[in-house]
């Protein structure tokens, strides 16, 4: 496994309060962005990818550990965190590997799993994946983007929008000028 050259000596001399033990599977654009954000929040992160060069790049930039290999493999995940992680986020380009990675993580004791699933054929199976397979969350980036664009278009002149109660309610802020009939 790769480890951060500075972190091993720093951890020995400084007291760190680590928020969560997180495994990120897949170091594409999404995986790299998540790693950057989660590392900035001082989480204990292990990244898994089949490309050792990507792992080395990430490990040299952020205070994370890296494992080369298939994130859907039991042996690879077992090496990431003994006793399971708090969270596994699978962001590879393969829906099937993302699902498998989440299943393996659950069996290893990981509390929460998030899978990036892009194939619309799996849309009807999302409830099954959550309820029966134990996935905490399924994210479809294209669908989420389309939903956000549609939400912005509903209130194009709004300054700010906040959603509540699992997106069932929305609070919208507008700037009203003095000549507005509502004033």
PLM features: what roles do these ranges have?
Residues 9-183:
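Cytosolic regulatory regions of ion transport systems
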């Amino acid at each position: 496994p790769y480890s951060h050259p500075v972190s091993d000596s720093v951890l020995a001399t400084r007291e760190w309060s680590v928020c969560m033990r997180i495994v990120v599977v897949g170091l594409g654009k999404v995986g790299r962005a998540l790693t950057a954000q989660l590392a900035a929040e001082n989480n204990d992160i292990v990244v898994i990818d089949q490309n050792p060069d990507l792992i080395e790049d990430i490990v040299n930039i952020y205070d994370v550990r890296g494992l080369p290999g298939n994130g859907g493999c039991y042996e690879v995940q077992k090496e990431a965190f003994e006793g399971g992680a708090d969270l596994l986020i699978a962001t590879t380009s393969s829906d099937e590997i993302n699902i498998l990675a989440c299943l393996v993580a659950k069996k290893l004791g990981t509390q929460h799993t998030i899978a990036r699933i892009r194939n619309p054929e799996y849309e009807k199976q999302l409830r099954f994946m959550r309820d029966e397979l134990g996935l905490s969350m399924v994210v479809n980036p294209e669908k989420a983007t389309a939903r956000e664009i549609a939400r912005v278009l509903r209130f194009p002149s709004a300054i700010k929008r906040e959603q509540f109660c699992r997106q069932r309610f929305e609070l919208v802020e507008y700037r009203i000028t003095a000549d507005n009939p509502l004033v």
